[in-house]
Design a protein with these regions (language model features):
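Residues within helix-turn-helix
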Residues: 296-297, 308, 315
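Helix-turn-helix DNA-binding motif, specifically the short coil turn and the N-cap/start of the second
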Residues: 292, 306-309
């Protein structure tokens, strides 16, 4: 596999790796591409000069990053034109990992992580009028903000972690998601229990942010849109000793929307279901609504959230039919909401076909 690694200057605990990848629109795959594949590939007519051009592009990006003092804002204007010229993606992975030759205090690590995230979201934070992002609930609200570009949401999600709040929400994921889709969770349940136990043992942030490398196994090339990928893969990478979080840049917004469109065609409505179920607040709402019909203000009171926040999440769940609305018998003009058992059965059926 053709790779290029470089340390990020004065950020010794962060490493960067650029991997040449191919997005195969016909088969909806993203996979690493080697020089030999390009030269001798049989499924597509890969040209050697095309690969060399991409390799030069990759090295130029690395060089630009170094020259800019690791200011990544130039990527928006730099990546897009080349993505349109050929079907390759340059994926830049930023690793937060331990440096065995350097002793770093917890405060230094926290500051390093905070500065790294701030470099990426500073403009977004100012435009959004938000002073700071703290805790997993605030993170959810940020990710739901339609003004934030898709690639920025991916990056914020991948680089942000608050251990105390995250652990609490992991338990919420586990206790709520499992009953909702219990028939399809037996494998995920066992795996997740192991990861959660390992995560609870961690006492040093430097162990939490360990080196994590993306593997492109030749037998696992298809990007399967499954519950384990969308709901638990992110948690797994953040909760397992020996792994860390990563961020990728290169798939621009329009390309991401195209990928989602293809995935929806290929997998029916499963992607939309899983995106809705991958939010902790919505899972907690479903847990409450499984017991009885509830109004917005009742749900807000139970979850200790504001009514506008609940209304936002309800609109998403209503759109894909996971919950249904009916008029209240006790209060004129007010809707009550409940879980659609039939739609949950549909989701379980779709999941079972992916095994």
């Amino acid at each position: 596999m053709d790779k290029f690694k470089v340390n990020l200057g004065k950020k010794p605990d962060f490493k960067m790796e650029a991997i040449i990848c191919l997005y195969d629109r016909k088969w909806n795959q993203v996979r690493a591409v080697t020089r030999s594949e390009v030269k001798y590939g049989k499924s597509r007519e890969f040209l050697e000069n095309e690969f060399s051009r991409l390799a030069l592009y990759r090295d130029t990006v690395i060089d630009e990053i170094e020259k800019s003092g690791f200011d990544f804002s130039f990527l928006d204007r730099f990546v897009q034109p080349d993505v349109e010229k050929f079907p390759y993606l340059l994926r830049l992975y930023f690793f937060s990992g331990k440096n065995p030759d350097k002793v770093v205090s917890d405060e230094e690590v926290d500051a390093l992580i905070g500065d790294f995230v701030a470099d990426w979201i500073n403009e977004t934070v100012e435009a959004d009028g938000t002073e700071k992002i703290t805790g997993i609930e605030e993170l959810y609200r940020t990710l739901d903000n339609p003004l934030i570009a898709a690639e920025d949401r991916m990056l914020i999600l991948d680089t942000f972690a608050n251990r105390k709040r995250l652990l609490s929400d992991l338990r919420a994921y586990f206790s709520i998601a499992v009953p909702v889709l219990e028939n399809n969770f037996h494998i995920i349940r066992a795996e997740f229990e192991v990861y959660l136990r390992e995560y609870e043992k961690i006492t040093d942030w430097r162990d939490f942010y360990d080196y994590y490398s993306i593997r492109f196994d030749k037998d696992v090339q298809q990007l399967d849109v499954t519950l384990s990928v969308l709901l638990f893969n992110k948690i797994r990478s953040m909760t397992t000793v020996g792994r860390g979080d990563y961020s990728s840049v290169g798939m621009r917004y329009n390309e991401l929307k195209e990928w989602e469109r293809i995935a929806l065609v290929s997998n029916g409505v499963l992607l939309e279901y899983m995106k809705a179920l991958s939010d902790g607040t919505r899972l907690r709402m479903l847990s409450e609504l499984r017991q009885r019909k509830m109004r917005v203000k009742d749900i807000a009171r139970e979850l200790k959230l504001t009514a506008p926040t609940i209304s936002h999440h309800i609109s998403i769940l209503l759109r894909i039919g996971i919950i249904t609305a009916s008029m209240s018998h006790s209060e004129s003009g007010v809707c009550e909401y409940s879980v659609s058992a039939d739609r949950i059965d549909d989701i379980c059926e779709l999941l079972s076909k992916l095994k």
